[in-house]
């Protein structure tokens, strides 16, 4: 079978996406892809979801933070951003999703939007609620571990032990 000429091939845009969740959660590529498809289908319907053709091309996730490159048909970037905004949890784990930028190539999306990572996280012992607890700190905010969950806090909410 012959290849299509360049002017007949579908054109793509690549969304650079940043993910954040609790430090002990693990979110896999397949789970993220499935939730993205469901969000697109629920928001855009079957025809709109097929037009956008959302698919995860690159994915990395560790220590509660992750990055993804989502491939979208040209002209469908706004519906794709809206579908990404509808994601609030993946596999039962709450997740924050930010579209860092849109590019015409995977390489440009990675270089321009995903390589500006903040500080790495560190574990510290803190006093929170009159008890010593473990907190995972990123920049000036921390996630304090309670019995079965985390609580988001800033440096003003706890004392370093």
Where would I find each of the regions flagged by the language model?
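Short beta-strand/turn micro-motifs at beta-sheet edges
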Residues: 2-6
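Conserved beta-strand -> loop -> alpha-helix junction used to position metal-binding or nucleic-acid-contacting
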Residues: 93-108
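Helix N-cap motif at beta-to-alpha junctions
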Residues: 71-77
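Hydrophobic side chains in well-ordered alpha-helices
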Residues: 80-83
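Surface-exposed, low-hydrophobicity interaction/linker segments
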Residues: 7, 12, 18-59
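C-terminal low-complexity, charged extensions that often adopt amphipathic alpha-helices
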Residues: 104-161
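A common structural junction motif
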Residues: 40, 86-95
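The conserved glycine-aromatic submotif of the RRM
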Residues: 63-69
């Amino acid at each position: 079978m012959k290849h299509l000429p360049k002017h007949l091939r579908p054109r793509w845009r690549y969304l650079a996406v940043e993910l954040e969740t609790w430090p002990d959660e693990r979110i896999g590529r397949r789970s993220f892809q499935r939730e993205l498809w469901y969000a697109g289908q629920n928001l855009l319907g079957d025809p709109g979801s097929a037009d956008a053709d959302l698919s995860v091309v690159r994915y990395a996730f560790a220590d509660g933070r992750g990055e993804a490159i989502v491939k979208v048909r040209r002209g469908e970037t706004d519906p794709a951003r809206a579908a990404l905004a509808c994601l609030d949890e993946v596999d039962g784990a709450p997740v924050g999703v930010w579209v860092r930028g849109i590019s015409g190539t995977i390489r440009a999306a990675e270089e321009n939007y995903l390589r500006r990572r903040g500080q790495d996280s560190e574990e510290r012992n803190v006093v929170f609620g009159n008890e010593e607890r473990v907190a995972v700190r990123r920049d000036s905010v921390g996630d304090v571990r309670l019995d079965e969950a985390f609580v988001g806090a800033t440096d003003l909410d706890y004392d370093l032990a």
